[in-house]
Amino acid sequence: MPEPAKSAPAAKKGSKKAVSKVQKKDGKKRRKSRKESYAIYVYKVLKQVHPDTGISSKAMSIMNSFVNDIFERIAGEASRLAHYNKRSTITSREIQTAVRLLLPGELAKHAVSEGTKAVTKYTSAK
């Protein structure tokens, strides 16, 4: 799964901009590179929790940085755990343990229960 770009600017209302073509000097068109972001997902969650609340582009950028940071921390810890146990695959068990190690108390419990729920939903939909 490709990792989103680190310095991705947040688009308004959490949507990605379409790839626009930029005119070059010799007449050929060059595609503008896409900036990956968690903005659309942050926006969807915001609307689930507070339907009447908006988010500024600066706040969206901060949320995007936060999600990237947490993703890297969990992935790094899960990688270390797999390495310690001489495993070459990161499973949901490593992710769960990494979350328990990284997040404090009640937050870890909620994250683990939500993660378990998501994995169950995914496997039942297959």
From Swiss-Prot:
Q: Where is this cross-link: Glycyl lysine isopeptide (Lys-Gly) (interchain with G-Cter in ubiquitin)?
A: 121
> In the record, which positions carry N6-acetyllysine?
6, 13, 16, 21
Sites of Phosphoserine modification: 15
Q: Which domain of life is it from?
A: Eukaryota
Keyword terms, alphabetized:
Acetylation, Amphibian defense peptide, Antibiotic, Antimicrobial, Chromosome, DNA-binding, Glycoprotein, Isopeptide bond, Nucleosome core, Nucleus, Phosphoprotein, Secreted, Ubl conjugation
Q: Entry's Pfam families?
A: Histone
What segments bear the compositional bias annotation Low complexity? 1-12
Q: What is this protein called?
A: Histone H2B
- The UniProt gene name for this protein comes to histh2b
